[in-house]
A protein has these predicted regions:
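Charged, low-complexity intrinsically disordered terminal segments
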Residues: 1-299
Length: 299
């Protein structure tokens, strides 16, 4: 980005640098025409929103803009919601998805995730919570509008999805550092950018990015994805038609959890929603403590 949004990001980064213990950095001068040669801009003359996450600290008021933006974007999608994320472990985000799945004419929701989180601890925290949430969402998906997929190479090797992207219809494009898990949306320091289409050119650009991402995952040309979406009106049907042998997207399969893994997931032991919950008793919190209130007692 360049222009006023770049200046705003610079101010944000300088402040965070000092909060992290760095020495103050002087503000640079605004340069004109600093866009790299040979790099075509996807969008020009658009308003860019900045959403932040900053945890509560003794000298800092918490900021949960990134989470609030996720919830608003999920609630506002009309036909299609496309998400790429390293994790899917936030109860609040899952609840927002569940509300859309309950609607008779809600949007399709496609989530791209890695097969498993990296490291030895993150799979225990993230994969188990994802399994519990996807199981619960599957029970709510009576209209069959939710799918999760994993990207794979032509040789069948899983590709680790590290992206943080949300595209709602051809109207909203969001990217940044926020993952769909409690730690990212409540405890970490994050920053996301988002644009909303206010003209046909911007809407076409947003759709082109979505179609290009799907084409990359499916090993086909973007024009094939665009044409198939136009024919079917469905992201899910498009993926199902185009995925096959070679580079492709494979559906998520809910794993069987051990009793310990299920307990860890249900109690959010390794992915608390805030500093206070790191020390809160397990009886007062858990993955589904508000889920049942949302369901209104439905089985």
């Amino acid at each position: 980005v360049e222009g006023p949004v770049a200046a705003a990001l610079g101010a944000l980064f300088r402040r965070r640098w000092v909060l992290a213990g760095g020495k103050p950095v002087a503000e640079g001068t605004m340069g004109e025409g600093c866009w790299p040669d040979g790099l075509a801009a996807d969008f020009t003359d658009v308003d860019v929103g900045i959403a932040r996450t900053e945890p509560e600290m003794p000298d800092q008021v918490p900021v949960h803009e990134s989470e609030a933006l996720f919830l608003a974007q999920i609630a506002g999608a009309k036909r299609h919601l496309y998400i790429e994320s390293q994790y899917f472990a936030s109860r609040k985000i899952a609840e927002a998805v569940a509300r859309r799945l309950d609607e008779a004419d809600g949007p399709e929701i496609v989530i791209i995730n890695p097969v498993t989180a990296q490291g030895w601890l993150e799979p225990i925290a993230m994969d188990t919570a994802r399994a519990r949430l996807m199981t619960a969402l599957g029970r709510r998906d009576g209209h069959q509008r939710l799918r999760m997929y994993h990207p794979h190479t032509a040789g069948g090797e899983a590709i680790y999805c590290h992206a943080k992207i949300l595209i709602a219809d051809d109207q909203v494009f969001r990217l940044g550092s926020s993952n769909v898990n409690n730690r990212s949306l409540r405890l970490d320091t994050e920053c996301d950018l988002a644009i909303r289409a206010r003209d046909a050119a911007t809407a076409a650009g947003i759709a082109a990015i979505r179609d290009g991402l799907l084409a990359e995952h499916l090993g086909v040309e973007p024009a094939v994805v665009t044409a198939t979406i136009a024919e079917t009106g469905s992201l899910i049907e498009t993926i199902e038609r185009l995925r096959g042998e070679g580079k492709t997207l494979k559906p998520y399969e809910v794993p069987d959890l051990t009793s310990v893994e299920a307990w860890l997931a249900d109690n959010e032991v390794l992915d608390p929603e805030g500093p206070d919950e790191m020390f809160e008793s397990f009886s007062k919190r858990g993955l589904f403590r508000r889920w049942h209130r949302l369901r209104g007692g439905r089985s």
